[in-house]
């Protein structure tokens, strides 16, 4: 492995122009679950997975994943943001679809190993890019009956990425959809599983085709309250209060959890509650938040079916609260701002 690393020293990447897409890297790490226990961590240079055509992940959706990032800081240190929360969330997602949870210590060991092995792909400080980390657990047993697999594979690969939205940190339009539901109130919406994203593809494609950044879902039961915002959580700002939906069909965002804490640190009130659609008209600022984009400020939200528009941004630009929250979170991730809550894990000094 050392010889391979020496031979692969030179990279010719325009870090500042990276898109949010897949780029091959040197190594991924894997761990198999067989006979009721997790095995040893293995390092692989292959991008392929040997898999039976009857594997449960292909037929019955036994698949859960995560997304987190490694950042090279101003001080040269490499930090991963809140990976303990990602370990908890993928464990919960796995258990939600009857898969064994990867132990938190093994999850952390694998993250550290895969980031270290692919150090040359960590974008430099100041480039605006980061190393995206994708953990994945899949059912591997060959079955044609609907039941949990007996064997599983947990793996992590990494790839350098640029901003999720080409516009970067800018206010963009969103649209409300009533034709589709992302997840049922007591379904898999709170788990990070592939089926939720498959269910959003048609609405997402229609929104993009119409010129919107993403689609907005209303609650599936009554179609009255704001729910998930594309593949991100929604929050609104008014009267010095950070307000985000309380729902049994929304993925609990680690970014949103962090922003709520930062809002409290800034002296704001935080509310998690139902947000009626008509309340959108009262927000001073609003955004969609998640690992990929951190915060995507909202310019306006269109409701095409009712021929109505909720204008959020007064000048088409991100508001002061969204901007401060974004800069603070990014500053913590990059080591520019004190990490008061001990969110960062130092991977390399």
Tell me the role of every PLM-derived stretch.
Residues 117, 139-140:
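Intrinsically disordered, low-complexity linker/loop segments enriched in Gly/Pro
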Residues 120-126, 146-148:
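Short, charge-rich binding segments
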């Amino acid at each position: 492995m050392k010889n391979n690393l020496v031979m692969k020293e030179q990279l010719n990447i325009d870090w500042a122009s990276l898109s949010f897409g897949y780029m091959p890297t040197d190594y991924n790490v894997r761990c198999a679950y067989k006979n009721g226990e997790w095995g040893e961590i293995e390092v692989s240079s292959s991008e392929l997975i040997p898999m039976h055509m009857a594997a449960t992940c292909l037929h019955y959706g036994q698949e859960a994943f995560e997304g987190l990032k490694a950042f090279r800081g101003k001080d040269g240190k490499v930090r991963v943001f809140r990976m303990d929360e990602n370990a908890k969330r993928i464990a919960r997602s796995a258990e939600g679809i009857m898969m064994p949870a990867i132990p938190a210590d093994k999850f952390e060991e694998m993250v550290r190993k895969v980031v270290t092995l692919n150090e040359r792909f960590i974008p430099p400080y100041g480039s605006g890019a980061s190393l995206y980390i994708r953990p994945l657990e899949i059912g591997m047993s060959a079955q044609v009956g609907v039941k949990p697999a007996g064997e599983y594979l947990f793996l992590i690969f990494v790839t350098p990425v640029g901003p999720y939205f080409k516009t970067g940190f800018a206010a963009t339009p969103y649209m409300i959809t009533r034709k589709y539901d992302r997840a049922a109130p007591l379904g898999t919406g709170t788990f990070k599983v592939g089926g939720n994203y498959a269910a959003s593809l048609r609405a997402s494609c229609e929104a993009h085709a119409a010129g919107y950044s993403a689609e907005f879902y209303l609650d599936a039961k009554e179609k009255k309250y704001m729910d998930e915002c594309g593949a991100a959580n929604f929050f609104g700002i008014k009267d010095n209060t950070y307000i985000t939906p309380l729902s049994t069909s929304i993925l609990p965002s680690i970014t949103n959890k962090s922003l709520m804490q930062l809002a409290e640190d800034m002296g704001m009130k935080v509310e998690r509650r139902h947000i009626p659609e008509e309340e959108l008209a009262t927000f001073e600022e609003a955004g969609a938040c998640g690992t990929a984009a951190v915060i995507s400020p909202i310019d306006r939200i269109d409701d095409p079916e009712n021929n109505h528009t909720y204008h959020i941004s007064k000048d088409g630009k991100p508001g002061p609260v969204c901007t401060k929250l974004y800069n603070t979170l990014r500053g913590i991730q990059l080591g520019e701002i004190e990490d008061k809550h001990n969110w960062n894990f130092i991977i390399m000094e």
